[in-house]
């Protein structure tokens, strides 16, 4: 797979696919521009090389309809501020008006295409739409790790038509960090897996079990593991159809010598509410009508001891309902332990990055992935469609 440094982009029309699907408030102001800042190195490199830069992205889920509230206008405005140069917003992502704008570009100019998902063809990986997108450029750069797991026209089909295709710095960096952590890790390698459902992490759990030395489990999904070994978890959310699978995973871990840690105590509540009555109880003493909302202090201490010896940490998913302050302590404790660790730490998806930002510890984490689903797909051992498309293109030429 080519990197953008490997191709000549001087004076060329360079379409850079990014994922700047950023959160907006009610007034359409950007509340977190992390994803925008993450793609700046690739854009600045292209500009320094004298390219004509065309930025393409999506925003939200407009389902193939033009939704004014999901326009790329706020993003174009933020790019203008960060790049310190004019960034013109195109009226669409394809069409004669866009084509005319591109033809008038001079070296060093920047255009931002309108929301790609205003066209259903983008979601459908439509070849004709991809061909029209590709006609705008001489070089296509995929720098959108967060959608690298999706078979969209601007991610996959476009590589069949663009003359030259390569990976941007962000995409390459994401892949390199994960590959190092999985294929050549400093050990012990500890995986922290949290979040709501075992079902959504099952593939990752199976694949990671082949690589990690220790597993740490939290979040609502821990309830399924706890019940699978006969703990009463009250009214906690449990995936009963996966109890055998959960028990089997733990047994497999034991047989191969991989430590598998589940909570020993929990913060439980009488209802799912920020102002619910709550208390800390040992796992064996969860009241029948109560539910687990967070890991308890004894569990946090146990997990801190596991992390203390770690040399590599991969974390996906919070330890509890951390968006409710009353049940955020477990996740925030883990953030603190990981941040204070000397291990190479990689954080990705499952709102874990939100917790890191909330705690103000981003600067103490080795790498925070911009991808959720894409990061999980790597944890499952899958080849990302975006990467496969770039590799096919290189093989063809």
UniProtKB/Swiss-Prot annotation:
Q: Which domain of life is it from?
A: Bacteria
Q: Does the keyword ATP-binding apply?
A: yes
Q: What class of enzyme is it?
A: transferase
Which Pfam families does the record cross-reference, listed alphabetically? Answer: PGK (PF00162)
| Catalytic activity as recorded in UniProt | (2R)-3-phosphoglycerate + ATP = (2R)-3-phospho-glyceroyl phosphate + ADP
- Alphabetically ordered keywords of this record: ATP-binding, Cytoplasm, Glycolysis, Kinase, Nucleotide-binding, Transferase
Q: Which GO terms are recorded in the biological process aspect for this UniProt protein? A: gluconeogenesis; glycolytic process
Identify the main location.
cytoplasm
List the Gene3D superfamilies hit by this protein, alphabetically. Phosphoglycerate kinase, N-terminal domain (3.40.50.1260)
- Official protein name in the record: Phosphoglycerate kinase
- Native source species: Desulfatibacillum aliphaticivorans
Name of the encoding gene: pgk
């Amino acid at each position: 797979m080519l990197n953008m440094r490997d191709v000549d982009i001087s004076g060329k029309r360079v379409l850079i696919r990014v994922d700047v699907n950023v959160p907006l408030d009610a007034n359409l102001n950007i509340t977190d521009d992390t994803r925008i800042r993450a793609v700046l190195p690739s854009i600045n490199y292209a500009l320094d090389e004298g390219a004509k830069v065309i930025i393409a992205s999506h925003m939200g889920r407009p389902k193939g309809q033009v939704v004014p509230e999901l326009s790329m206008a706020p993003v174009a405005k933020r790019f203008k501020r960060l790049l310190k140069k004019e960034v013109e917003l195109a009226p669409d992502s394809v069409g004669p008006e866009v084509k005319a704008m591109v033809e008038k570009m001079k070296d060093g100019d920047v255009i931002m295409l309108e929301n790609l998902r205003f066209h259903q063809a983008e979601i459908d990986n439509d070849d004709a739409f991809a061909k029209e997108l590709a006609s705008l450029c001489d070089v296509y750069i995929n720098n959108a790790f967060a959608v690298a797991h999706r078979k969209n026209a601007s991610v996959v089909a476009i590589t069949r038509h663009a003359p030259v295709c390569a990976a941007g710095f962000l995409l390459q960096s994401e892949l390199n960090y994960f590959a190092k952590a999985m294929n050549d890790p400093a050990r012990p390698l500890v995986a922290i897996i949290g979040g709501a459902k075992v079902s959504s992490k099952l593939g990752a759990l199976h694949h990671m079990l082949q690589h990690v030395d220790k597993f740490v489990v939290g979040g609502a999904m821990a309830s399924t593991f706890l019940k699978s070994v006969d703990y009463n978890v009250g009214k906690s959310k449990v995936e009963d159809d996966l109890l055998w699978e959960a028990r089997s995973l733990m047994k497999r871990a034991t047989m191969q010598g991989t430590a598998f840690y589940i909570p020993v105590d929990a913060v439980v509540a009488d209802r799912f509410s920020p102002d619910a009555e709550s208390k800390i109880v040992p796992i064996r003493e969860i009241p029948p009508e109560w539910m687990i909302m967070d890991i308890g202090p004894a569990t946090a201490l146990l997990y801190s001891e596991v992390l203390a010896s770690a040399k590599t940490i991969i974390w996906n998913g919070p330890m509890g309902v951390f968006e409710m302050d009353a049940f955020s302590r477990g996740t925030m404790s883990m953030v603190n332990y990981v941040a204070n660790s000397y291990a190479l730490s990689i954080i990705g998806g499952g709102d874990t990055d939100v917790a890191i930002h909330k705690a103000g510890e981003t600067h103490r984490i080795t790498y925070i992935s911009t991808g959720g689903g894409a990061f999980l797909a790597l944890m499952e051992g899958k080849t990302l469609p975006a990467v496969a498309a770039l590799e096919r293109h290189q093989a063809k030429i």
